[in-house]
């Protein structure tokens, strides 16, 4: 038997990495926000047996993002998950314009190893060579996929994953990459007789706006000002993005609209509005849209499940959980938004 090639952990402070940690976090979210989660699901018309084919979910500290994780991920029932992650440090490794896969056999989970699905090799084998690269280094230092795994494994011990990081690229390049990726996934699904939503699902990772004029490496992300009035205006801007891009039927023009909201017109490497998933989200959505066509599947319809920020709600207390805590401040001068979106 081959020796497993395990990916380690990038963040043991913001996220759970032990069984007792994730179980305590889930219990505390249920105690603090369980009624709220139930009310949201009822208001959004979500039945207990509804299954997401695609979800957008955050990757920030559990203390801050808290209930957004189960809100976005609880209805993911498929055991095989294609996860589109952010490549936060792609510039450091000079990576852009290609999908980034890994070669690990397993990722570390709180209940034991999480296998990388053999679908990865089938998918990669069907992609144009210039469309992807393999970088274990990039995957090892990136936290956006890792953040979701403790919750996903808590809900389903049998999960397998296909992690794909999405670095800098223009919307035109996203369109070039999404179609062959969707085709590769569709062919693999047909070969293995996999149902979308039941056997395989997709997750796109992003935190929403990174806002404020303090603690952002000398940059000022406070477009509307770093006070209560600015906070209210920033929230209105966020809800406009969610409404314009994700609520209702998924369509390419709405996906492109998201990039126009978030990516600078003069340089796709720069922010217009600071969602770190400005590449992972549209690439994931475009792939899903093409997959819908190729599989002759029902049209994907988005539901904005919820939105909050690192300063909006009561934190989940993790201070007693074996070194867990927060990795950044949360003030009017430095805060992050979180969105949960489901596509059925």
Show where each model-derived region lies.
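Active-site histidine-anchored catalytic micro-motif
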Residues: 1-286, 290, 294-295, 307-315
């Amino acid at each position: 038997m081959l020796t497993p090639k395990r990916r380690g952990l990038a963040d043991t402070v913001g996220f759970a990495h032990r069984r007792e940690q994730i179980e305590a976090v889930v219990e505390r979210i249920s105690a603090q926000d369980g009624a709220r989660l139930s009310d949201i699901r009822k208001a959004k018309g979500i039945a207990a047996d509804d299954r997401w084919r695609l979800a957008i979910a955050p990757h920030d500290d559990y203390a801050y993002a808290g209930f957004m994780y189960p809100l976005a991920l609880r209805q993911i029932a498929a055991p095989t998950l294609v996860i589109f992650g952010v490549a936060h440090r792609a510039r450091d490794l000079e990576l852009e314009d290609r999908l980034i896969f890994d070669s690990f056999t397993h990722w570390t989970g709180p209940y034991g190893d999480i296998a990388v699905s053999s679908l990865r090799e089938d998918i990669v084998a069907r992609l144009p060579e210039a469309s992807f690269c393999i970088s274990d280094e990039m995957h090892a230092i990136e936290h956006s996929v890792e953040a979701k795994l403790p919750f996903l494994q808590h809900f389903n011990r049998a999960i397998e994953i296909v992690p794909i990081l999405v670095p800098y690229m223009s919307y035109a390049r996203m369109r070039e990459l999404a179609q062959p990726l969707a085709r590769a996934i569709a062919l693999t699904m047909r070969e293995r007789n996999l149902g979308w939503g039941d056997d395989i699902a997709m997750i796109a990772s992003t935190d929403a706006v990174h806002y404020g004029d303090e603690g952002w490496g000398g940059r000022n992300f406070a477009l509307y000002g770093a006070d209560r009035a600015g906070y209210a205006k920033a929230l209105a801007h966020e809800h406009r993005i969610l409404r314009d891009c994700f609520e209702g039927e998924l369509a390419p023009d709405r996906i492109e609209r998201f990039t126009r909201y978030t990516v600078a017109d003069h340089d796709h490497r720069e922010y217009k509005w600071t969602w770190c998933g400005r590449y992972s989200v549209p690439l994931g959505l475009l792939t899903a849209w093409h997959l819908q066509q190729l599989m002759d599947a029902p049209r994907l319809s988005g539901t904005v499940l919820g939105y909050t920020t690192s300063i909006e709600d009561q934190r989940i207390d993790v201070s007693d959980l074996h070194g867990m805590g927060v990795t950044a401040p949360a003030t009017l001068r430095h805060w992050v938004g979180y969105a949960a979106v489901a596509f059925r």
